[in-house]
């Protein structure tokens, strides 16, 4: 066979495939070799980098890998800020960092760039597990960090995830094992570390805490301590915040190794941005809402954030101002909202040109809203650090912004000292009298018309008073000098809610306290930093149905009035005076809250009272477990008694039975029975008469309606086809347009209308004459009573047909046409 035959061509193709495989393998080897060389060169540049060099002005001056550099260029990040110039070189060298810088100074990139570089130099893949963990105190800030990470890391092959509350725990757990970088909130992350099987953090390379002072605060202390226990000691830790803590106890909890303290603005004249104009207004507590309303009405073409101390206040002011329509779009944001709603509101405010956002401190830290013109603080912040974070939502990235703080006269002196200590200078301004407008009457009208709004106003009042009462800084917050009656009146409330005070705890601890008891069993994180406890018992559909709650704002208030809200809301414990408590529920609460042990100190069995007469002996562990379930304790309770009330309001049992002696005093049983039968027969006879009269009246009305209907039908038949009717301009009564013509005398009749009226009373066979008919005696009628048409006559060469009646249907018109066509 020739060399060019099939066999030769097959051998040639096989050789080409082998050469192609060899080229690919060689190409991979060369590519791997180049990557190793690039990594060695990059590491060499990092080792030679001087962190204190003043020549670092752009990201291109830093020793960064190509994927990170290209991602920064594509996101239009070119020039380094002060905190980035100081922190990134140290982080690239692997040192722990404790960073503090002004709000809006670019701290997010200061830790995201080192995270990407650390994993890139380690050649991290999805099989290596979690490499970097970024913790944020709020969901909004976590979402923002994740979006920035996606932008600058678009050219990397790392997998990144966002783990926050408000989403399905099961769906997150399925994907968690494949993540290289996680952005999370403390509570949800700890929940995954405790519950998600196969989630391994032993290879963690870097831990980042944004707004670290807030994360290490009292509310997150347990979550952070438990979370750090799961993490390896050999990791790099970065802490960033606008107000950083240097306490040794905080740093020891996080196991920092010789941290570098980076504070680029520590020696600056002010702790707030240079372009921020800061003012404060001294306004009494009852006039705060009036001042806020006047401010919004004069700044309709602005983007405004209004901070308040509690979510109840945010909801009340938003609902009331929305009904009054100030002329600017209104939004509200607080920690009790669902995650989907919070994201939607955040996006709407971000994209809006002019808008006003009422918010709590959930957006006070780190969240970047573009082009915010004003930051208004209606309530005095708890400390100067909170003030700095709040005003930092405007004047970001060297732009300009303005901030206004409302202070009660009792708060002015003390809080200005706190601001001066933090290098914050604010100027006092006065409100023009023509800009003030009292809205107390409008709020009172709204509260009167809407019970929902009234009860929401009561909740807002209680939450504000509670926040002031629990403040630690008594030099600033002087509770006794506040005009609470005037404040309640300014909210539109009919009176001042009664509040019972008890000795409070630390305000931050209560503010960030876990609400696991309120929402246990849910797989979503109810608020930032809280720890959820999952129910172990099986919940049937009947249990779920019994646990359903009305979502109306009145529901919790009503439950509290009934004493059924003991564990519903930790925020309001011991602050609303309970006017009425159900005995059974109180007994169940007392039984459920008794001592853990089932025996008394003397060894006797413990007896728990479940009411006035019912008792439960705790003589076993099974009986002791009953105390934890109100549902199981119900069968040991006394049976309820149904009562009826007489006309005087006195309660009586529904079936009030006599004893034997009282019954015998009334006489013989047979006579009593006969009297009862006779009395009932009399009642039946009286009722029978009324029923017969009613039936007779209904039959009479039915006959009258039938007769009226028949008369109407007869009148319609006599009238024939409908004639057009004229309506007088000043009357609704129809008038016959031909009535005037009928009243005129007919030619040749002498104006006598007596004959015409007599003709109207002719037998039914003969129809009444019309206005155009002549009074001829020779009129002929057909069998059906209709006048016959006379023969046609010739007048002046024209054919004329005389009609005895006006055509009133199609049959008459056809007969007239046939007569005209005859010769």
UniProtKB/Swiss-Prot annotation:
Biological function: ATP-dependent RNA helicase required for ribosome biogenesis. Involved in the release of U14 snoRNA in pre-ribosomal complexes. Required for pre-rRNA cleavage at site A2.
GO cellular component, one term: nucleus
Domain of life the protein comes from: Eukaryota
Location relative to the cell: Nucleus, Nucleolus
Basic and acidic residues bias locations: 13-34, 539-549, 680-694, 703-720, 793-808
Domain Helicase ATP-binding, first and last residues per copy: 88-262
Domain statement: The Q motif is unique to and characteristic of the DEAD box family of RNA helicases and controls ATP binding and hydrolysis.
Domain annotation Helicase C-terminal: ranges: 288-443
Subunit structure: Interacts with the U3 and U14 snoRNAs. Associates with pre-ribosomal complexes.
Residues given in the record as ATP binding sites: 101-108
CDD domains: DEADc_DDX10 (cd17941), SF2_C_DEAD (cd18787)
InterPro entries, per the entry: DEAD/DEAH_box_helicase_dom (IPR011545), Helicase_ATP-bd (IPR014001), Helicase_C-like (IPR001650), P-loop_NTPase (IPR027417), RNA-helicase_DEAD-box_CS (IPR000629), SPB4-like_CTE (IPR025313)
Keywords, ordered alphabetically: ATP-binding, Helicase, Hydrolase, Nucleotide-binding, Nucleus, Ribosome biogenesis, RNA-binding, rRNA processing
Annotated motif DEAD box, positions: 210-213
Record's catalysed reaction(s): ATP + H2O = ADP + phosphate + H(+)
Region (Disordered) location: 1-34, 511-549, 680-810
EC code(s) of this entry: 3.6.4.13
Entry-linked Pfam families: CTE_SPB4, DEAD, Helicase_C
Record-stated family: Belongs to the DEAD box helicase family. DDX10/DBP4 subfamily.
GO-annotated biological processes: rRNA processing
UniProt GO MF annotations: ATP binding; ATP hydrolysis activity; identical protein binding; RNA binding; RNA helicase activity
Short motif (Q motif): ranges: 57-85
Protein name stated in the entry: ATP-dependent RNA helicase dbp-4
Cross-referenced Gene3D superfamilies: P-loop containing nucleotide triphosphate hydrolases
């Amino acid at each position: 066979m020739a060399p060019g035959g099939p066999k030769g061509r097959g051998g040639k193709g096989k050789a080409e495939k082998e050469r192609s495989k060899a080229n690919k393998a060689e190409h991979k080897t060369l590519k791997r070799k180049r990557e190793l060389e690039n990594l060695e060169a990059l590491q060499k540049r990092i080792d030679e980098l001087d962190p204190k060099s003043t020549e670092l002005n752009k990201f291109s001056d830093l020793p960064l890998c190509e994927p990170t550099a290209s991602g920064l260029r594509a996101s239009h990040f070119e020039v380094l800020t002060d905190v980035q110039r100081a922190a990134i070189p140290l982080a690239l060298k692997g040192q722990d960092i404790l960073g503090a810088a002004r709000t809006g100074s670019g701290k997010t990139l200061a830790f995201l760039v080192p995270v990407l570089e650390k994993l890139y130099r380690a050649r991290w893949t999805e099989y290596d597990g979690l490499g970097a963990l970024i913790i944020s105190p709020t969901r909004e800030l976590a979402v923002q960090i994740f979006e920035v990470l996606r932008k600058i890391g678009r050219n990397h092959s790392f997998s990144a995830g966002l783990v926050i509350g408000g989403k399905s725990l099961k769906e997150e757990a399925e994907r968690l094992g494949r993540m290289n970088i996680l952005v999370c909130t403390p509570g949800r992350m700890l929940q995954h570390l405790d519950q998600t099987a196969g989630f391994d953090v032993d290879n963690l390379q870097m831990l980042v805490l944004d707004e670290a002072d807030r994360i290490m605060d009292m509310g997150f202390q347990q979550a952070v301590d438990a979370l750090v226990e799961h993490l390896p000691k050999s990791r790099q830790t970065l802490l960033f915040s606008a107000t950083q803590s240097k306490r040794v106890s905080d740093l020891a909890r996080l196991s920092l190794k010789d941290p570098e303290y980076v504070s680029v603005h520590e020696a600056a004249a002010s702790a707030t941005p240079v372009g921020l104009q800061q003012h404060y207004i001294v306004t009494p507590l009852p006039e705060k809402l009036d001042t806020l309303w006047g401010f919004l009405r004069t700044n309709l073409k602005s983007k405004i954030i209004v901070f308040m101390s509690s979510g109840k206040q945010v909801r009340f002011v938003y609902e009331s101002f929305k009904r009054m329509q100030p002329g600017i779009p209104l939004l509200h944001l607080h920690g009790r909202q669902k995650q989907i709603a919070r994201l939607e509101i955040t996006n709407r405010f971000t994209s809006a040109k002019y808008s006003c956002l009422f918010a709590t401190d959930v957006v006070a830290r780190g969240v970047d809203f573009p082009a915010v013109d004003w930051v208004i603080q209606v309530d005095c912040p708890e400390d100067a650090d909170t003030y700095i974070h709040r005003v930092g939502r405007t004047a970001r990235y060297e732009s300009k912004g303005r901030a206004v703080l409302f202070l009660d006269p009792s708060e002015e002196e003390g809080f200005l000292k706190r601001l001066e200590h933090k290098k914050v200078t604010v100027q006092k301004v006065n409100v023009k009298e023509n800009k003030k407008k009292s809205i107390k009457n409008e709020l009172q009208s709204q509260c009167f018309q809407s019970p929902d709004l009234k009860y929401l106003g009561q909740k807002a009042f209680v939450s504000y008073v509670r926040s002031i009462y629990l403040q630690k800084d008594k030099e600033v917050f002087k509770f006794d000098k506040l005009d609470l009656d005037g404040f309640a009146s300014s909210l539109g409330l009919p009176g001042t809610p009664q509040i019972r005070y008890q000795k409070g705890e630390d305000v931050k601890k209560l503010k960030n306290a876990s609400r696991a008891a309120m929402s246990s069993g849910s797989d979503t994180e109810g608020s930032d930093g809280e720890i959820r406890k999952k129910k172990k018992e099986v919940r049937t559909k009947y249990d779920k149905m019994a646990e359903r709650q009305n979502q109306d704002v009145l529901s919790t208030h009503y439950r509290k009035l009934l004493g059924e809200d003991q564990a519903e809301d930790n925020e309001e414990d011991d602050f609303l005076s309970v006017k009425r408590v159900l005995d059974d529920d109180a007994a169940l609460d007392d039984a459920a809250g008794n001592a853990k042990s089932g025996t008394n100190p003397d060894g006797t069995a413990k007896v728990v009272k479940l009411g006035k007469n019912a008792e439960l002996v705790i003589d076993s562990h099974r009986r002791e477990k009953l105390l934890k379930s109100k549902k199981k304790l119900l069968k040991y309770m006394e049976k309820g008694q149904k009562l009826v009330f007489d006309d005087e309001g006195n309660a009586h049992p529904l079936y009030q039975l006599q004893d034997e002696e009282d019954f015998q005093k009334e006489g013989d049983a047979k006579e009593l029975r006969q009297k009862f039968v006779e009395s009932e027969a009399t009642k039946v006879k009286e009722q029978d008469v009324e029923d017969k009269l009613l039936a007779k009246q209904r039959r009479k009305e039915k006959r009258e309606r039938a007769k009226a209907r028949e008369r109407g039908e007869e009148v319609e038949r006599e009238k024939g086809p409908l004639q057009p009717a004229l309506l007088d301009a000043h009357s609704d009564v129809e008038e016959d347009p031909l009535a005037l013509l009928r009243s005129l005398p007919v030619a040749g009749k002498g104006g006598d209308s007596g004959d015409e009226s007599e003709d109207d009373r002719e037998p039914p066979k003969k129809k009444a004459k019309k206005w155009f008919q002549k009074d001829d005696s020779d009129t002929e009628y057909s069998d059906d009573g209709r006048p016959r048409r006379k023969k046609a006559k010739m007048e002046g060469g024209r054919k004329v047909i005389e009609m005895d009646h006006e055509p009133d249907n199609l049959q008459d018109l056809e007969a007239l046409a046939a007569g005209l066509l005859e010769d």
